[in-house]
Amino acid sequence: MDVPTSSTDSQEVKPIMPIRTKAACKFYPPHILCGKGAKTNKRGKRGGAQKASTKKDIGETTPPVAKKSKVAKEPTMLAAAAAPEAAASPESSAAAAAPEAAASPESSAAAAAPEAAASPESSAAAAAPEAAASLESSAAAAAPEAAAAPATPAAPEAAAAPEVAAAPATPAAPEATAAPAAPEAATTPAAPEAPAAAPAVEEEEMVWEAAAVVGEAAVKPPEEEPTSGEAVATTTMT
């Protein structure tokens, strides 16, 4: 009876020893398993390793918080930098539009003055209604094109309009050729500005009536006039 018990005790003790040294130390404190030898056990080293790992984890977790705060500050700096730019852009656009608006009536008036002075008012008064209707259609058709076109190319056209209008007015052919070229130069600077569009169109209609009277007196075919073709094309597109 004693021998089997001793054999069983020896069999039970053998598997407990490796568990005490390797696996059991992970789940039980060292003073229960190892007793006095707790100081020399690996548990202390593992505890130190765990403490170091916890410190590393703490060190790894803190920098992302600082990075998030920096990222949160960067959009505010970008927004603060974009605010003055956005505030300056309307001013620059308004400042750029102001000289154009100021120059467009002057250029249109300068282009209209020589034509009004050169056109004879006493010729063909019966053709005025037809000329007024054609001018209204051409001005209405040219308005969207002038609004879509940029303001920079309109400046050379406006500058070239007085030169074309200042041509010698003795023969009737130069006046007829200057009449179709003038509407584009006069409508383009006036159309981009909404407030100045209405009075400019009214003045242009008066000028084009006189120019159309001169063109009809010269009996020039409509195919040679570019404005008539453009007006028909734009009306069909609209």
UniProtKB/Swiss-Prot annotation:
Sequence repeats lie at residues 79-93, 94-108, 109-123, 124-138, 153-158, 171-176, 180-185, 189-194. The keyword Phosphoprotein does not apply. Residues 153-194 are annotated as: 4 X 6 AA repeats of P-A-A-P-E-A. Keywords: Cytoplasm, Nucleus, Repeat. GO terms for biological process: spermatid development; spermatid nucleus differentiation. GO terms for cellular component: cytoplasm; male germ cell nucleus; nucleoplasm; nucleus. Specifically expressed in testis (at protein level). Its main location: cytoplasm. Residues 39-48 have a biased composition (Basic residues). This is Testis-specific gene A8 protein.
